[in-house]
Amino acid sequence: MEEDTWIVQTTGLCKTYGDGAAVPALIDVSLSISSGKFLAICGPSGSGKSTLLNLIGTLDYPTSGQVIVDGVDINSLKGDRLADFRRAKIGFVFQLFNLVPALTALENVMLPLLPYQRGLSFKLEKRAQELLEGLGLRERLHHLPGQLSGGEQQRVAIARALINYPKLILADEPTGNLDSQSGEEIGRLLRHLNRDLGLSVLLVTHDANIAAYADQVVHLRDGRHVEQT
């Protein structure tokens, strides 16, 4: 397979925390994710799942090794260039939703791009509304997060992740705060984004039922890549 068909490649990836008694979080992790695929990362607590996602998402730098996202070596980007790349290429979905309590669902979805869309806010609002309606939230556009169920809040968070037309969705335990039925709905939704919209999805989960929606599953243990199924 040619290099330009990969959305993510990591080579010899290591991450160590602490200056004194250093704690290794990732040890020599190398993996490749094909563009347009859905990959789940599984493993026990402390296995390095979220650390790996943060490195791929450009939220942190590796201690050593290489991360390439959409053909770009992340280590070569700093400051505004890194932020611009992240905003253009990656959408994030978190376990705790991270919605602003005082903003409506519509405003939360618009928020990431508001500083960059001056004079075009009507187009941004139209895009946000279309996303929310497409996720079944037509009647919730002007509701505050506290007026929404957990599953509805996570769908708002997914719409927010899609607002910038990303190539890659990174979802860190997106069903961890949901009941099993809502969790399954989010799993199916992520699969829809991958299969029907062609987005690459990288999911961290401890739930085998949610991981089953992925094309492949990577297993981590003690910071090491131990298996891929």
Across the structure, where does each feature detected by a protein language model lie?
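Short, low-complexity, intrinsically disordered N-terminal peptides in bacterial proteins
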Residues: M1-D4
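ABC family nucleotide-binding domain
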Residues: W6-L220
